[in-house]
Amino acid sequence: MKYISNAKYGEPVETGTIYRGDNKRLGICVHRLHGCGETLYMDCMALGIIDRKLNNTSAISAINEAQSLAKQELDLLSKELNSILNSEIEISRY
């Protein structure tokens, strides 16, 4: 997947502080927080992930880690959805 960096024109894209995925549905973004050094964080609006700390400090490794974390979350959601769909519907007052 393509990522857009906010690196200054003429500088390597890895020098940026924000790497936003070119996917509108998931909205994966890897970024640094001002005042937190070289630590990278991820956001994924579709999964409700905001400022999750990543273990990698290089852009490519952090993006790979963020994609892996998004996949893990999607797998958990898929299992939960399958559980809901395979269970009998029950309606109660309380």
Regions picked out by a protein language model, each given a short descriptive name:
Residues C44-Y94:
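Mixed-charge, Lys/Arg-enriched low-complexity segments
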Residues M1-N23, S87-E88:
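Negatively charged, low-complexity tracts enriched in Asp/Glu with abundant Ser/Thr
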Residues L26-D51:
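Short aromatic-glycine-(Arg/Gly/Cys) micro-motifs in beta-strand/loop hairpins
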